[in-house]
Amino acid sequence: MKNTELEQLINDKLNSAAISDYAPNGLQVEGKETVQKIVTGVTASQALLDEAVRLQADAVIVHHGYFWKGESPVIRGMKRRRLKTLLANDINLYGWHLPLDAHPELGNNAQLAALLGITVKGEIEPLVPWGELSMPVPGLELASWIEARLGRKPLWCGDTGPENVQRVAWCTGGGQSFIDSAARFGVDAFITGEVSEQTIHSAREQGLHFYAAGHHATERGGIRALSEWLNENTALDVTFIDIPNPA
């Protein structure tokens, strides 16, 4: 498949053109024209690029790519080494950020809901769905369930939350700023990847459980699902590689 055809295929699947983002979605660094072997991962770190080189991949597809708004345009140090690895090995780099959070099937939010057994009921605002667990569970039990499913112990604050949790809102990655919207909507718990200092005060003062389950851990699902979709629907050879990250 041509590198530009792959870009169009995924853009169409994720409806990228309809979503404004903080970084370019699609082909970010051009490599060889023909793509067959692909490595995917959450972030285009040096470790992932090194794996792509080792596996002789033609392309790398990630959720967190390069060239973010507000980022320094200077190419030096870490950025130079990463780009040099791609260019020297003629590897294409593709990134899809918010489109891969929001997609109702392959998106990070949809995949997290499926993993945790949450039935999606609607959306509080863009990128913040809400839903229900099959039955009410104590806050500590939900924390244990999140740990079991994600392989990472979440930071849990349930000081003033209800005895049991059933109505849940969530936003994968760095979605802690949405806690107030979730509280106003009226859920028992809010799940995201990261926590800020003020997040805990918001949870305590508004009476809901809060879980910070890891930016990386909550965003493995989307890129993994996209990898599976490509393997099932094309003749491409796609391998998801999880580079461990406790954050």
From Swiss-Prot:
Q: Name one GO cellular component term.
A: cytoplasm
Which residues are the signal sequence here? Answer: none
- Assigned keywords, A-Z: DNA damage, DNA repair, Metal-binding
Alphabetical GO biological process terms: DNA repair
Q: Which domain of life is it from?
A: Bacteria
InterPro entries cross-referenced by the UniProt entry: DUF34/NIF3 (IPR002678), DUF34/NIF3_sf (IPR036069)
Q: DNA damage: present as a keyword of the record? A: yes
Q: Where does a divalent metal cation 2 bind?
A: H64, H215, E219
Q: Which GO terms describe its molecular function?
A: metal ion binding
The UniProt record gives the binding positions of a divalent metal cation 1 as H63, D101, E219
User: Which residue ranges run through the membrane?
Assistant: none
Fill in the subunit field for this protein.
Toroid-shaped homohexamer. In the hexamer, 3 dimers assemble to form a ring-like structure surrounding a central hole.
Family of this protein? Belongs to the GTP cyclohydrolase I type 2/NIF3 family.
Stated role: Provides significant protection from radiation damage and may be involved in the degradation of radiation-damaged nucleotides.
Query: What protein name applies here?
Result: GTP cyclohydrolase 1 type 2 homolog
Provenance organism: Salmonella typhimurium (strain LT2 / SGSC1412 / ATCC 700720)
Gene of origin?
ybgI
